Amino acid sequence: KDGTEVPEDFRGYTMALATCLERIRGEFNAPIQVISAYRTPEYNKRCGGSKNSQHLLGKAADIRIAGITVADLASTVERLIEEGAIIQGGIGTYPQQNFVHYDIRGNRARWKG
């Protein structure tokens, strides 16, 4: 949201994440709203992000799809991971803010915000 370009070192991650997001989008045949993706350390601190946030590496996106519940979006992401269609990573559900965090960290992490 601060308009900073993703550093060259992280662009491979953001491309892999974008590929996964496109696969998720295809499941619903609807646009994904990306609320937050790559963050600079300064922006991450301002928005209250974790100091070890995957957003800092360009590996994470907070997403929503109009008309789809957080629970349905998260369960679809989980299924796609289990099927090997997208990269294993973190899924955080934030029903009060109406978004799902998905990241491609490479290992399983689940939480509720």
Enumerate the language-model features and the residues they cover:
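N-terminal start-of-chain detector that recognizes signal peptides
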Residues: 5-7, 32-38, 71-76
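Extended, low-complexity, intrinsically disordered C-terminal regulatory tails
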Residues: 21-48
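Short, conserved helix/loop micro-motifs enriched in His/Cys and acidic residues
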Residues: 1-8, 45-60
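Catalytic cores and adjacent binding grooves of peptidoglycan-active enzymes
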Residues: 52-113
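Short His-Asn-centered micro-motif
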Residues: 13, 35-37, 66
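Amphipathic alpha-helical interface surfaces
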Residues: 13-20, 30, 43, 59, ...
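A short linear-motif detector with a strong N-terminal bias
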Residues: 12-15, 39-44, 78-83
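Active-site acidic/histidine clusters and adjacent loop/turn architecture
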Residues: 1-31
